[in-house]
Amino acid sequence: LSRRQRQMCIRDSSGSSGRGNLVMNRYSLKEHKWSRVQDVLIDGENKRNAYWQLYVDEQGTIHLSWVWRETWQVETNHDICYARSFDNGVTWYKSSGEQYELPIKLSNAEYACRLPQNSELINQTSMSADAGGNPYIATYWRDPDSNIPQYRIVWNDGKVWHHRQVTDRKTPFTLKGGGTKMIPIARPRIVVGGGEVFYIFRDEERGSCVSIAHATDLAISQWTITDLTDFSVDAWEP
C-alpha cells in the first residue's frame, strides 16, 4: 500500500506450476477499482514459471526476486533473478540501473546468483533491503559437491552481487518428489537494518525451535546463532 498514491498492488500468477506468467494489478482506494498494470510482467514463455517474493523498502521501491521452475517438480528450480520498480510496478530496472524491456524473460532477466537445476534450491522465501536500497535475499541450496542444503544469503552492495553461507548443517535431504514433504528446515526470513542482518529459521538439528542468525559484516560472514525458543515449533515456517 502506497500512502502517497493511496493504491494497492497485487501480483498474481497465471497458468500452472512450471508453465505460467506473473502479472500485476493495482487497486485505487480513491477510485475504488482495479486496473491492470501490465498484461505480463514475467513471461514463462509457456515453458516455465517464476516463483517470486517481494519487499517494499522505506523509499517505496518494490524489490522483486524469483527462481525459475521448468516443470511442476521442485527439483527443476534454478537461478535467482532480480528486478526493482520505483513507480509502483509500472517500469522495472536491474540493479545496474538498466531499464527492463517488458516482459521479463529467461533471456533478459538479471541473475543475482546462477544455480543449476537439482541444487535443492527452495522457492518463495523472503527479501529485505537496507537504507541504501540494496536488496538482500534469504534462501537455501546445496553445493554441487555436497548433499546437504545450507542456508544462504544473496545480496547486492550497490555494485555487484554476493552470496554467503549462513549455517553449517550436517543433515542431508532432498526436495525431489511430488506431494507435501516433511523437510527438516523451514524457509528463512530476513531483516536488515543499521548494518546488521538477522536471519530467522527453523532446523531439526537445533530441535526445531525458532532460531536467529546475526551478522554485522557479511564480507567475513561470521554468524552468531541464538535459539529464541526452548521448545519445538514442529513444521512452522517464519
What are these regions (language model features)?
Residues 11-16, 65-70, 138-143, 200-203:
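Recurrent small/Gly-Pro-centered beta-turn motifs in extracellular repeat architectures
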Residues 59-61, 132-135, 194-197:
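Short coil/turn segments that connect the beta-strands within blades of beta-propeller domains
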Residues 11, 24, 64, 82, ...:
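Hydrophobic strand positions within the blades of repeat-based beta-sheet folds
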Residues 39-45, 94-119, 163-181, 229-236:
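Surface-exposed loop and turn segments in beta-propeller and other repeat-based domains
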